[in-house]
C-alpha cells in the first residue's frame, strides 16, 4: 500500500506538467447539448477554471508523453489546490484539456495509474528537496480574482439563472449528507508540511460553522484508508461532531452511501464536477481505486467551494455592516457640525452682550464714584464751615482790645465805687523839663516860651490843681493810681519842641494819661 500510495502521489505531481503539453480544442466531444457551465454559478466557474488540468483529461497515454528528466525539480503538491484562476500566461481554457474519447472506462484508468506508479517509485519523490519558491509555470499561485473571468463563461451566465429550478428539484430528492474533512486527506495523502501557507494568496476567511481544509489537514491518521476500516466506524465517528453546513446541504452524498454494494446515486453537483474534471460518473458500488480517488477529489473541491462561498457571504455581511456604520457616522458627524456652528453663533452673541453689559456697568460705576466724590467734598466743606463758625465765636474774646469792652463791666461790679459828683480828675499833664547849661544865655524866644508855660501853670492853679516845685525827677510820677488795670496808655505824639534850637533846646514829652471812668 505504501508503494501504491507513493506512486499515486508521483502521478499527481508529474501530471500537472504533462497536462500542459496536451493539445487544445479536443474537449467538445464530451459536452452535452446544454453546456455544464450553464449549471454552475459564478464562483464555481472561477474555481473550476484550473481544475480541468488533470491526467484523466488528456487523450494521449502517459507512455506517449514526454518522459520527465530525473534532474528536473518535482512540483509541489499544491498543484492539486489550484482550483482558482491562475494568472500564469500558459493557463488554458477549461475546454482544452477534456478528452475526446467517450469510451473512457475504469480499466484504462487503472492500467494508466499502475503504469505510472511503477515508473515513479516512492524513494525518488521523498529524497527530492522541496524548494520554497517553485519554478514558474509548474505550481500556480492560488489567487481568487473576481474580475479575471474568461469570456465564454461570461456569455453563458444568463442560462445559468434559468436552470435554478432543476437544481432545486434535485436538491429536494437527494438526502442530506455529512462529509468528514479528514476522509479527503486520507485519499489525497496531504499533510501540513506539504502545503505551506506562504504560497497561498487567499485572504483569511472568517471561521465558518462547517469543516474546512485546515481541519482535514490536521487529521491524526492521514495514511489510513477509509475502506480498510469496518463499516460501523463511520456513524460512530460522525456522531460526536457538531452539525455543520455540509450536513444540511444536498451538494454531497452521504459517506455511508459510498460503501457496500449496489447502485450509486450522486448529487447533481458531484456529477457536474466529475464531468467538468473529465472523470467518468460511477453508477455502482463498490468503487474502484480510480473512481474512489476521483470522487474524493471532487468532493473536496465542492467542500472548498462551499467554504469559500460562506466566507464571501460573511465578508459581504461584514462590509455591509461597515458601510452602514460609516453612513451613520457621517450623518452623525454632519449633525454635530451643525450643532457646533449653532453653539459658536450663540457664543458670539453672548460675548457681544457681555461686552455691552460691561460697558454699561463701568459707566454707572464711574458716575456713582463721581457723585460720591462731590457729595463727600460738599459734606467736608459744610463740616469745616460749621467748625469755623463755632470756633470763630469761641475765639472772639481773645481779640486785640478785649479789656475796653468785656473786662470793664466785671471790674466795675467788683470795685463798687460810690458815685461822686465832685470834680473828676480825668487827665494829667506830665511835664519833664531839662535845664539848660548855665553858660548859654537865654534867648528871647525861650523866654517867651517859658512865659507861656508859666501861664499854663497859673491856669492849673486856678483850676485847683496843686503845683509842684521844680525838682529833678528821674522818672514820671503818676498822681492818681487808683485804677491802673483799666487805664490804657496811648502814645499820641512826640513833639519836637523846636528844630531851631540847634541841639540845645530841651525836648519836652507830653504824655497823656487817659483815664476812662464810666458811670452807671
Swiss-Prot record:
There is a cross-link at residue 178 (Glycyl lysine isopeptide (Lys-Gly) (interchain with G-Cter in SUMO2)). Keywords: Activator, Developmental protein, DNA-binding, Endoplasmic reticulum, Glycoprotein, Isopeptide bond, Membrane, Nucleus, Phosphoprotein, Signal-anchor, Transcription, Transcription regulation, Transmembrane, Transmembrane helix, Ubl conjugation, Unfolded protein response. InterPro entries: bZIP, bZIP_sf. It is found in: Endoplasmic reticulum membrane. It comes from the Eukaryota. Residues 1-378 are cytoplasmic. Transcription factor involved in unfolded protein response (UPR). In the absence of endoplasmic reticulum (ER) stress, inserted into ER membranes, with N-terminal DNA-binding and transcription activation domains oriented toward the cytosolic face of the membrane. In response to ER stress, transported to the Golgi, where it is cleaved in a site-specific manner by resident proteases S1P/MBTPS1 and S2P/MBTPS2. The released N-terminal cytosolic domain is translocated to the nucleus to effect transcription of specific target genes. This is Cyclic AMP-responsive element-binding protein 3-like protein 2. It comes from Pongo abelii. The lineage of its organism: Eukaryota, Metazoa, Chordata, Craniata, Vertebrata. The gene is CREB3L2.
